[in-house]
């Protein structure tokens, strides 16, 4: 109400599983104007840093947050050529088991803490611990 501009900065893109979306809804509901400036989604940045394309040719891709449940992840793995699994750190061991059972662990790239000091981008390492900002790109391969 003091005629000031404020900024809310987020990692990745504000439109993809960002806490910022909830804050923006409250700000709009309170009667304030907003402007959203797009960012680079973490999985796009991670794929570029890993040197892998997310999709090629006629391949399909799903983006699934692990907090939506392991069944959602399994469904995506069953129905899409490539799957991005976001916010994977909390249940990573259970996820390794699913990927092992489906023979997909060696087709998985891990992006952990992209752009941060402790960034890890590389193959799945079941002995390594991963945090909240962990994204997996599972490339099953498919239609070219």
Predicted regions span which residues?
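Conserved short-loop catalytic and cofactor-binding motifs
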Residues: 11, 61, 83
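General beta-strand structural signal in soluble alpha/beta enzymes
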Residues: 8-10, 36-39, 56, 85, ...
């Amino acid at each position: 109400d003091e005629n000031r501009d404020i900024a809310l900065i987020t990692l990745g893109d504000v439109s993809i599983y960002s806490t910022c979306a909830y804050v923006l809804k409250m700000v709009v509901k309170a009667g304030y104007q907003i402007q959203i400036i797009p960012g680079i989604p973490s999985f796009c940045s991670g794929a570029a840093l890993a040197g892998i394309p997310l999709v090629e040719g006629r391949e399909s891709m799903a983006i699934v947050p692990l907090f939506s449940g392991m069944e959602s992840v399994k469904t995506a793995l069953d129905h899409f050529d490539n799957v991005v699994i976001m916010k994977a750190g909390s249940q990573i061991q259970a996820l390794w088991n699913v990927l092992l059972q489906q023979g997909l662990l060696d087709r998985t790239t891990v992006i952990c803490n992209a752009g941060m000091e402790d960034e890890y981008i590389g193959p799945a390492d079941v002995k390594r611990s991963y945090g909240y900002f962990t994204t997996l790109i599972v490339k099953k391969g498919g239609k070219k």
